[in-house]
Amino acid sequence: LDFDLGTLLEDIADTLAVRAIEKELELICSVNPTLPQWYKGDPGRVRQVLTNLIGNAIKFTAQGEVVLHYELILSSDGRQLLRFTVTDTGIGLSKEQQAKLFQKFSQADSSTTREFGGTGLGLAISKQLVELMGGEIGVHSEPGKGSSFWFTLDLEIAEAKIEPIK
């Protein structure tokens, strides 16, 4: 399925902006004009993963910002991959917490569940979706310094579609 990545990212940002505004957070979605805009893939799965990562970033950030950034990178075997990164100025995670993060029903600890809510399924589902699309997902984080969740996808570039004006 061909999809317009820029439009998809704008839709996601628009959907989550209300939550960010309620918490007085800055939600920054940096669309890279030098990269192709159209890709072949599953926009529904991409949307679900990004919505989950950005939603979590907003949930666990009390002040500051949540930034979505994407870029093309080269894999170790020379393939071009699209790498998405969601960075926040939130509570951050210890190495021990990071190790359990992508398991089902896992949250940083029980106090996190009480304070922030949620089932602990979001990251496990995101990991599964990313892997179904042939990608990888990971996190870099430090307690008190925020987190940076990333995932890579091997999406084929599609021909740009020009939509008729309605």
Q: Which ranges hold each PLM region?
A:
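Short alpha-helical Gxxx[C/S/T] motif in the catalytic ATP-binding
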Residues: 117, 122, 126
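Short helix-loop "hinge" at the ATP-lid/N-box region of the Bergerat-fold HATPase_c
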Residues: 57-58
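Glycine-rich ATP-binding loops of the HATPase_c
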Residues: 134-140
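Conserved catalytic submotifs in the C-terminal HATPase_c
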Residues: 1-4, 21, 26-37, 73
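Disordered, acidic interdomain junction associated with two-component signaling
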Residues: 22, 30, 75-80, 96, ...
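Short alpha-helical segment within the cytosolic histidine kinase core of two-component systems
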Residues: 10-22
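Short conserved segment of the HATPase_c
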Residues: 93-107
